[in-house]
Amino acid sequence: MAQVPIIQGGMAIRLSTARLASAVANEGGIGLIAASGMEEQELRTEIRLARKLSNGKGLIGINCMVAARAFKDLIVTAAQEGIDLIVAGAGFSRDIFAVGREYNVAVVPIVSSVKLAKISEKLGASAIVVEGREAGGHLGTQQSIKEILPDIVKAVHLPVVAAGGATCGKDIVELLRLGASGVQMGSRFAASEESNASRFLKGMYLKMKQEDVVQIDSPVGYKGRSIRSPFAQLSLEGRAPRPTVCDACLKHCTHQFCIIRALSRAQQGDAKTGLVFTGANMWKIHEILPVKEIFRRIIEEVEAID
């Protein structure tokens, strides 16, 4: 694991890029670049920039959606660039383990069940991320992280990273006490100065209330946790505009709407026609802070509890 047992969640589309990942690595954590939605050359550029900005500190990885048609090409590209780890969610892939062995890259699947945790260990995972219903984006379960974490920790003999709902030091301590080796945080870093979210989008985070957090049906085939934007409301009502152009970016798609374009519009600040993924506890965050200050406060909170 990293010097500080915190992984910054890989948030697509283009919320977590080199600037955010390197800032997290510089503080001793693991910074993830969200590869989903990127072209291969763009990903190469981001990885190289993250390496340069992190000055060899911490670890730099990528997160990629298994459901993406370009999944294998993107993880191979990252492996060729000497990435430290590959985190994969929104589906389960056996291909990733062969890539990990070929390039000697750590493979970290996102799972939500004992069954997939055991399969991951058998196939050669270096660690697993266990994601509960509190997480942002695509969800693999409707069970709380605190419900599923202890059983998975007991079932495998490799590092288990807990994901879903953590925004402060107190949350991290609770998950570590349940047996986690580390904690993945997305929302807290989405609302950072280094996040690639637009200024308008960061403003939305700070204005959120608990009742603004909803779950929509994603065309990927999973539930997706998002802010109740006008677009999300249309999706909840089954009235989201169907795509007029299709890039065939997903292996399987219901074509309810274009998830890649909806997320991209949100990242650019289009709150009306964009889909804004969020964790269940984003509404608890009231400041946009530099990554360095986020780490300082978290460490201070953890030490005060210990």
Each model region followed by its residue ranges:
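Active-site metal-binding loops of divalent metal-dependent hydrolases
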Residues: 11, 165-166
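Conserved active-site-proximal phosphate/metal-binding subdomains
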Residues: 135, 142-161, 167-306
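Active-site entrance/lid segments in N-terminal catalytic domains of soluble metabolic enzymes
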Residues: 1-159
